[in-house]
Amino acid sequence: MPPRNHSNWIKAPKIEYISSECYNNFEVFQQEQEHIFSKVWIPMCHISEMYDLGCFRTTQIAGTNVIAVNSNFGIKAYRDHNIHSPSGVLSAPPEQGTELHCEVKHGGMIWVTLDPNPTQSVDEWTAGAFDCIADAIDTEEMEVFHYH
C-alpha cells in the first residue's frame, strides 16, 4: 500500500462510517439528553454519603438539577429548580421540586431517573450486569470515602 498524502487523508472513505459530527453537534447532544439520558436510570451517589437524616446530594442529569435527600420517608429524589449550582446551594426545601423515581440498589448506589413513568426497575434495566460482583457489593455495607 502506498503512503497516504494530504489529499488521501481528507477524502471520505468508501465505507460506511459514523461522522465525527455526532460528537460535537449541539442538536445531537440535545436529542441524546431528551431521548436517552432523561429516560434511563443514572447512579447518582452512594447511600453512605447521606446516612444521616437531612443529608442530601445534588447533581445534574440530562441538564436537569436533581437532589437526593435522606428524609423521614427514606431516600427521595427531586427535580429541583432551586439549586443554584450542582455544588448544592439550596434556596428552598427540596420537597418543592417534582419528585422523581429513585431506588437504592447494587451495593447501595442511589439510582434516579427523570422519566415520570419508567417502564423498568433498576434491576430490570441493569439486566444482570451486576450479577458477577453481587456477592462482593451486596454482602456487607460499603462506605464511600474521599481523599481530600
Where are the model-predicted features located?
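Rieske [2Fe-2S] iron-sulfur-binding subdomain
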Residues: M1-K76, G88-H148
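Short cysteine-rich loop/turn motifs with clustered Cys
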Residues: Y78-S85
